[in-house]
Amino acid sequence: MSDEIKKNNYSADSIQALEGMEHVRMRPSMYIGDTGVRGLHHLVYEVVDNSIDEALAGHCDTISVIINEDNSVTVEDNGRGIPVDIHKKEGVSALEVVMTKIGAGGKFDKDSYKVSGGLHGVGVSCVNALSDHLRATVFRDGKIYEQEYERGKSMYPVKQIGETTKRGTTVTFKPDSTIFTQTLEYSYDTLAGRMRELSFLNKGITITLTDRRHTKDNGDFEGEVFHSKEGLKEFVKFLDGNRVPIISHVISMEHEKGEIPVEVALIYNESYAENIFSYVNNINTHEGGTHLQGFRMGLTRTLKKYADASGLLEKLKFEISGDDFREGLTAIISVKVQEPQFEGQTKTKLGNREVVSPVSQAVAEMLENYLEENPNDAKIIVQKVILAAQARHAAKKAREMVQRKTVLGGGGLPGKLSDCSEQDPAKCEVYLVEGDSAGGTAKQGRDRNFQAILPLRGKILNVEKAMHHKVFENEEIRNIFTALGVTIGTEEDSKALNLEKLRYHKVIIMCDADVDGSHISTLILTFFFRFMKELIEGGHVYIAAPPLYLVKKGNKKEYAWNDDQRDLANERMGGSAAIQRYKGLGEMNAEQLWETTMDPEFRTLRQVTIDSLAEADRVFSMLMGDEVPPRREFIEKNAVYAKIDA
């Protein structure tokens, strides 16, 4: 950040209050997206974003996040401290304005903050409104100030409670149980993922996460310290840790073009996937936007120019496409924009046109320098591009074959599909069932009006290790495309999934509750993530939860999904109940499968969502890729959460 910003006076005059808070408690989803798990965690992100803004302005380098024993959260930074002097317009302390007025804060004042994070931009006041209790403590000008709030309303005026040599702001809040009715339990892993991401995006900042709900064997609380010296370069290494690189270095740069700071880091690996993650002011822009457009333009033009000059493309009999330059690419783009305009379905697509050219120029300069200085790597990249073009040509033919077999192409449905009679896709669901025998039981137990069954023969192809044309040639995968009625464009610019003719709005993976079943579920999820991501993002993918046990005594019976439920059911029946352990779906008869796993009134379905594309990509490449040590480490760390049937 510039020295000019650091020198500016950050006081009550810097705080602008835009509107009142009346709406927040009535319509919380308008402000934080939802009141489920995602919205609950978003409260933490809003408070942390304030501290990150202080860091971006050059006034803070340490942030602490603590999950307390009662699931309240404390966020502390060593910034300047929120101003506490009287706000001229509002007539109360600036701290109270920040905490009780939506949109109030220095981030709307360009002199105090050049750029600011926070997707919704609602700030800590929204967190305050949605909290049962919040306490703000400010360390500023040698004094300690405090104010507490209940459901967004101050309990007393800001008061001085002591003196100090430190500076910064500490906010402790407890979410309101009348608003967050689904859960108040914070996920350590979810918060850790976001804090790690923020540390990579803002190098030099130290973010500490502590979970006081869990104590380690040595007596310390569970926790991690996130600090990155190399920023995006380190981020790429972290994401690509389970893939084999084909070039010697991560290519990276930091640039400021036309007052738009641009950071890029990229590497090529042996995989066939393109993984580009884009950020604006620390917000993950899932839907891309103008910064991604600029990156692709700069990358394609520069590599095409080099490849043409090298003469390596002369023997190729067809045109190179933009996609060919991005196969096996992992890249991160981060830009800072003063007034970002967000578009798209989830408001995570950058719309600022002025961003395209600076990003494109910065990427072009970075790549030109690297290719010139590293001729061996340059040749390897071009050879990778040629192989990608040849594979794309073969995959296009395979995709066209899939298109001809889909309903859109006039072909028939897969012979193994037992369809439903309902014609409205919104009311229809299809079960992807492991094995023909379980598929037979599911066909007998289903409600034929709205439930379809597609049996899958054994383990489907591991798409993480397969070239794209091999994926489209696989019969089981072609059957899934055909049954769902979805298509992938055969032209390279329109490879996005077309969900307009999706035949079922619920796609349910139903596998055995054992290790093999989990493996098959993971293979199917990997396929969906790599080739039908829109299906997951649209909320259409679910995993069925068949029970592990039947507990029976006389005429009484209960199903149990874990050991605790099994033991409680046995106790309720007076002990000595007969316990049957289901090793597979085939062990249940049609009636049992219906009442436990398929009846909408009683079944449990787990909806598959993606909180972080970058983290999901890393986990899928680790679980399904070639590198064994990271996979072993992940399994050992998470084995405690798994039920393994020996």
Language model feature labels by segment:
Residues 82-104:
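Short conserved segment of the HATPase_c
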Residues 390-409, 424-429, 440, 444-446, ...:
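C-terminal interaction appendages of subunits in large macromolecular complexes
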Residues 53-54, 81-82, 515-516:
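Residues immediately C-terminal
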Residues 85-90, 291, 322, 469:
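Conserved, non-catalytic sequence blocks in retroelement Pol enzymes and Pol-derived host proteins
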Residues 26-45:
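Conserved short strand/loop->alpha-helix "switch" segment adjacent to the catalytic nucleotide/phosphoryl-transfer site
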Residues 1-14, 21, 45, 53-55, ...:
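GHKL-family ATPase ATP-binding module
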